[in-house]
């Protein structure tokens, strides 16, 4: 009704020497001369759904400034012990607070749920902190994350509860009753704290409230929900037209903007 025509199984190949758009089609290469072009080609994640970032070198060859595509809304890598990885991978860390610092040193905290994977952490809570965590990785080779495993208890409350006689209870049972920690949270404490820290009520309570997790990498770009990087803001005017290519506009995940989600969820 609006005059829009959809051409499926067409891949944009850039421009020919006369500025016409080139397309690879089932019937061979097609050229199209236009006055205005809107590029909305996605980022670089989930290439099998079409957004493979192959447009980046095409624009760079025309003088458009591009920041390299990196994972965003993604999982992060931490090499766990075989016991934790084999026993608890895939289990949720529910009702926790995750904290880190921005590149400028600002404290950032979010409450929610994360998933312990066989080689790290993922889930909506981790995705929400993916930008500052990735920036730390790029700057120093590792990222520092702190988990509060019992956000509804103060450290003093936990210390007092854990200082009481166990009366034959195991530590796991005591932590479940007094701090509300399930098996995966208890296992994570044993993974990240020393035996001496676990045995002392003061350091154990501190660890429950601020468990340090060092992350060593991101999951691959192709697994990320979205990608950071893309066409730099300085390469665009206020209408999102490319300064180097008048009449050509860019939109969506192609832009260098840290979006809260990406085309993968729209497609899925």
Where are these regions (language model features)?
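A conserved short coil-to-beta-strand element within the FAD-binding core of flavoproteins
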Residues: 8-20
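Residue-level recognition of phosphate/Mg2+-coordinating polar/acidic sites
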Residues: 22, 36-40, 46, 97-248
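Central beta-strand plus flanking loop segment that forms part of the substrate or channel wall
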Residues: 55-98
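Short loop/edge segments at beta-strand edges and connector loops
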Residues: 6-10, 68-70, 219
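A structured beta-alpha segment of the ubiquitous adenosine-cofactor-binding alpha/beta core
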Residues: 12, 24-31
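A conserved FAD-binding loop/helix module that cradles the flavin
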Residues: 42-62, 242, 257-268
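Short beta-strand to alpha-helix junction loop
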Residues: 1, 7, 46-51, 78-82, ...
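Hard-cation-handling environments
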Residues: 253
């Amino acid at each position: 009704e609006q005059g829009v025509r959809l051409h499926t199984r067409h891949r944009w190949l850039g421009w020919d020497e006369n500025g016409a758009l080139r397309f690879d089609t089932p019937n061979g290469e097609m050229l199209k001369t236009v006055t205005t072009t809107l590029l909305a080609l996605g980022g670089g994640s989930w290439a099998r759904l079409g957004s493979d970032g192959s447009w980046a070198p095409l624009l760079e060859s025309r003088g458009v400034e591009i920041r390299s595509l990196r994972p965003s809304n993604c999982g992060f890598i931490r090499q766990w012990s075989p016991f934790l990885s084999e026993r608890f991978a895939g289990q949720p860390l529910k009702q926790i607070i995750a904290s880190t610092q921005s590149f400028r040193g600002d404290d950032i905290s979010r409450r929610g749920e994360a998933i312990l994977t066989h080689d790290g952490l993922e889930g909506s809570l981790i995705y929400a902190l993916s930008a500052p965590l990735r920036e730390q990785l790029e700057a120093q080779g590792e990222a520092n994350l702190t988990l509060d495993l019992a956000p509804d208890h103060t450290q003093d409350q936990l210390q007092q509860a854990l200082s009481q006689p166990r009366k034959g209870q195991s530590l796991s049972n005591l932590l479940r009753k007094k701090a509300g920690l399930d098996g995966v949270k208890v296992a994570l404490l044993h993974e990240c704290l020393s035996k001496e820290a676990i045995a002392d009520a003061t350091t154990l309570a501190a660890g429950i409230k601020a468990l340090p997790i060092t992350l060593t990498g991101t999951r691959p770009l192709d697994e990320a929900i979205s990608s950071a990087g893309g066409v730099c803001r300085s390469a665009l005017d206020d209408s999102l037209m490319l300064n180097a290519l008048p009449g050509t506009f860019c939109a969506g995940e192609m832009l260098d903007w840290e979006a809260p989600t990406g085309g993968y969820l729209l497609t899925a």
